[in-house]
Design a protein with these regions (language model features):
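Glycine-rich phosphate-binding loops at beta-strand->alpha-helix junctions
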Residues: 104-112
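Active-site core segments that coordinate phosphate-bearing ligands/cofactors
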Residues: 13-67, 76-93, 114-210
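Internal glycine-rich flexible loops
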Residues: 96
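Short acidic/polar alpha-helix capping motifs at helix-coil junctions
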Residues: 53, 103-104
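A charged helix-plus-loop insertion that forms the helical arch/lid used to bind
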Residues: 2-12, 74-78
């Protein structure tokens, strides 16, 4: 496992390259995108690596197979949920081999590795299922109706709402759920702002009361 890059770290080193291979894809052109971070990691560690988001890394660890990547978490790396493919501009790059094989959310990936099951005394029949982003999970767990929306305070502040069709606008991402779409946008500000108003001890106590 190599060095990770924080979610809120801007990576401007490959700005010109990114703009040339992501024409019209504003969500990929920000210095905070997964693509910007991926290219920075490739510059540092070379192309004989695999690029995985946190959830894909953990799932792969349980399977002892890091082949796969879940569709929602890989949008900011360039995965097109509508066309279900990576951008054509990626095809001739030397780093395409670093990308995961994308699988839809909710699909069974396989059973837990036998050695890990024995090590942690887990049922060897446990199946690993591809997940989704944290804010999508919060939206689904809330059980909201089609006319309702949700604000999620996490690393970022995210606003989500169900829509019949994907919304292709700057700053908006759309995630497929069955025949509908969870559409929303996120800021680069999040729960870190709480540290300006509460001490670590107060945050710990307030969190305990949730």
């Amino acid at each position: 496992i190599g060095e990770a890059i924080p979610y809120d770290q801007a990576c401007n080193e490959n700005k010109i390259l990114i703009e040339s291979i992501t024409v019209g894809e504003d969500h990929l052109q920000t210095p905070y995108s997964s693509l910007a971070k991926a290219l920075k990691l490739i510059d540092k560690f070379g192309e004989n690596i695999i690029l995985r988001h946190q959830s894909d890394l953990i799932t792969g660890w349980f399977l002892k197979d890091w082949t796969y990547g879940e569709e929602g978490n890989n949008i900011k790396l360039g995965w097109d949920l509508i066309k279900e493919t990576w951008p054509k501009s990626y095809l001739n790059t030397s780093w395409q081999k670093c990308l995961p094989l994308i699988i839809k959310s909710g699909k069974i990936l396989g059973q837990i590795d036998n050695d890990l099951a024995a090590r942690f005394k887990l049922n060897k029949q446990i199946r690993l299922v591809s997940g989704t982003t944290d804010s999508n999970a919060a939206f689904l767990a809330a059980g909201l109706g089609k006319e309702e929306g949700l604000t999620v305070l996490g690393t970022t502040i995210v606003v989500k709402k169900i829509n019949k069709t994907p919304i292709k606008e700057k700053g908006i991402t759309s995630h497929r759920v069955s025949e509908e779409w969870i559409c929303g946008g996120a800021s680069n500000a999040g729960c870190g702002i709480l540290s300006q108003f509460f001490s670590d001890l107060e945050i710990k106590e307030l969190s305990r009361q949730i």
